[in-house]
Amino acid sequence: MRLDVVTIFPEYLEPLNVSLVGKARARGQLGVHVHDLRDWTYDRHNTVDDTPYGGGPGMVMKTEPWGDALDSVLADGYETGCGEPALVVPTPSGRPFTQELAVHLSERPWLIFTPARYEGIDRRVVDEYATRMPVYEVSIGDYVLAGGEAAVLVVTEAVARLLPGVLGNAESHRDDSFAPGAMANLLEGPVHTKPPQWRGRGIPDVLLSGHHGKIARWRRDEALRRTTANRPDLIERCDPAAFDKKDREMLSILGWQPDPDGEPYGRFWRRTPGMEE
C-alpha cells in the first residue's frame, strides 16, 4: 500500500516512522510519502490561505497549491504503478471513522491524505478530485482539532495494522472492538497477563482454567458488559438476531431486553424498566 500526505507541517507526521507503521515501512509493506504543501506556492510568503468569500472569521486554504500538489502526487503515483488512488479528507464534518471503514480502506492500494488547517480547504478542491477518484471525508470524533494531521495518524495506524503481515499474529485483530463479525457492535473486554497476583488483585479463575469454551464465553460476556456500560448506543441499534441465547441471557442480566416496537435502523434493545441508573 502507498500513502501520501500533503501538509503544511511535515514534521507532525514523524510518528509514522515508529511502532508498527514504522516497521511496516521498513519491511516494504507500506510506502509513506509526506509532502510539504508550501512546495507548491510561488509567492515570497509561501501563502496557502486567504479570506473566505461571504465574510466570516478565519482563513480558508487556497485551491492553487492544493491542486498543484495533488496533481504532482498523482503523476508520481501513476508513473510508479500504484493502482487506483482514493482521497481521504479528515474533517469534523465527515462521516464517522469506524473499524468497518478502516477495513475498507486497508483493501485499497493507494490513499492520499489532505489534512487541512484554519477553516478548511476550499470546497472546489474536493469536488474537483471527486471526479477523478473515490473521496472519503472522515471524522475521528465529535470535536475539532487545530488541524487534520492528528486524524491522519489515527487513520493510518488503524489501516496499517490490518495489512497482511503487519501484525505478528494475523489473528490479533479478530477480537478487536468493532471487528467485523461477532465483535462488529461490541467493545473488547478486559485483558490480563502475568503475574497472577499484583497488589492483592488476582486473575479471573476462568482465564486460568484452560477451558477454551468457558474462556470464550467469559470474554464475550465481558464485551457485552463493557459495551452496555460505555456505549449503550451500540446495543440499542443492534438486531436481536445478532445475539445467541447466551448473549441474550447476559443482556437480560445487565438490564436489557428486545424492544418489541423496534424498527429497522432504530433502537432494537432497551433497558429493562426499573433497571436504569
From Swiss-Prot:
EC class (word): transferase
Keywords tagged on the record: Cytoplasm, Methyltransferase, S-adenosyl-L-methionine, Transferase, tRNA processing
Gene3D superfamilies: 3.40.1280.10, tRNA(m1g37)methyltransferase, domain 2
Binding site for S-adenosyl-L-methionine: 140-145
Record has Transferase as a keyword: yes
Source superkingdom: Bacteria
InterPro entries per the UniProt record, alphabetical: Alpha/beta_knot_MTases, tRNA_m1G_MeTrfase_C_sf, tRNA_m1G_MeTrfase_TrmD, tRNA_m1G_MTases_N, tRNA_MeTrfase_TRMD/TRM10
Main subcellular location: cytoplasm
EC number(s) per entry: 2.1.1.228
GO CC, any one term: cytosol
Keyword tRNA processing attached: yes
Catalyzed reactions: guanosine(37) in tRNA + S-adenosyl-L-methionine = N(1)-methylguanosine(37) in tRNA + S-adenosyl-L-homocysteine + H(+)
Location relative to the cell: Cytoplasm
MF annotations from Gene Ontology: tRNA (guanine(37)-N1)-methyltransferase activity
BP terms from Gene Ontology: tRNA N1-guanine methylation
Pfam families associated with the record: tRNA_m1G_MT (PF01746)
Extent of the signal sequence: none
Family: Belongs to the RNA methyltransferase TrmD family.
Record note on quaternary structure: Homodimer.
PANTHER family according to UniProt: TRNA (GUANINE-N(1)-)-METHYLTRANSFERASE (PTHR46417:SF1)
Reported function: Specifically methylates guanosine-37 in various tRNAs.
The protein's name in its UniProt record: tRNA (guanine-N(1)-)-methyltransferase
Organism: Streptomyces coelicolor (strain ATCC BAA-471 / A3(2) / M145)
